[in-house]
Amino acid sequence: LTAGLLLLGFQAAAQDIPQAFQGKWAGHYEGKVSPKHIRALCAMGYDENAAMDNVYVSEDSGFYIEIGKKSIELTGWEWGAKYTKLNYRIYSPDKIAGTARVREEEPEQGTQIYNDNFEFSLNRGVLTQRFRDFSTDGSGKKVWRTRTLMRCK
């Protein structure tokens, strides 16, 4: 039984991220955005100086997730993280969740490497990420937050 469970864990870790998740996604650090804002964020890319037509989007409001076959890369204003060595707890065409090795880059903190949970789901072309982050109440506690993103075309 133990050998079977170990093999199952290895197979889950070796699987590619489902094709439906792969690609570049844009949104805000937290919360929802409109299709108009997504088009502007996708046009802006990682260049905060790019021209934006009729849409106010500041350089610190854009958030991008690029999902490949084996990794997930998150990029925000002066911050980035790459998730590798994914081990799935849930693996389906519309939801993936599990643990990963994270390499986080931040100017004030430098580079940090740690293991963390990840959770992504798809519903009608919208990518939702649930993630843990520090509370804004100053308590230092971590709370669950949600961000929604749409695919860049």
Where do the model's predicted regions map?
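Edge beta-strand at a domain terminus
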Residues: 83, 87-90, 124-153
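Sec-dependent signal peptide recognition
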Residues: 1-3
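Predominantly extracellular/secreted and cell-surface proteins with exposed
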Residues: 56-104
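Short, solvent-exposed loop/hinge segments that bridge or flank secondary-structure elements
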Residues: 16-71, 106-115
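N-terminal signal peptide c-region/cleavage motif recognized by signal peptidases
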Residues: 9-11
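Acidic, glycine-rich flexible loop segments
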Residues: 91-124
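Short, surface-exposed coil-to-beta transition loops
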Residues: 58-61, 80-86, 109-117, 141-146
